[in-house]
Amino acid sequence: MPIWVDADACPKPVKEILFRAAHQRQILLTLVANQYIAVPASPFIKSLQVSSGFDVADNHIVASLVAGDLVITADIPLAADAIAKGAAVINPRGQEYTKDSIGARLNMRDFMETMRSSGVVMQDGPPPFSQQDRQSFANALDRWIARQRKI
């Protein structure tokens, strides 16, 4: 039950939660990014730097994961691809994406992208990462780990 992290934009508090969980529960954790990501010394944690380029890290994650793995990402298309391969997906704010919810998220993302590119919608991006987001992520990760332990 490895965990794959789309690490380029992953908030530091989320990485810290993942580092602790991987080490304490002996879960393989791989952070994939197109830049160097420092990780603590642990046989369960590794950082993988891929070449720069559009979706290179995303494509590596999708190619490497197997059904039952967990992917941490805020990237909706990556989440959709991971779910299609049978992975579980949680975003850094603790939202779990599923086969039932990802289609609507993709449609909304595409709609908003169209609106932004036509100049109709101006958006400053997501709100700052909060303590509530941190707690929501930790809770979602704990739920996933508990489900894996029952299998």
Swiss-Prot record:
It comes from the Bacteria. InterPro entries: UPF0178. It holds the Pfam family DUF188. CDD domains: PIN_YqxD-like (cd18720). Belongs to the UPF0178 family. This is UPF0178 protein CJA_1978.
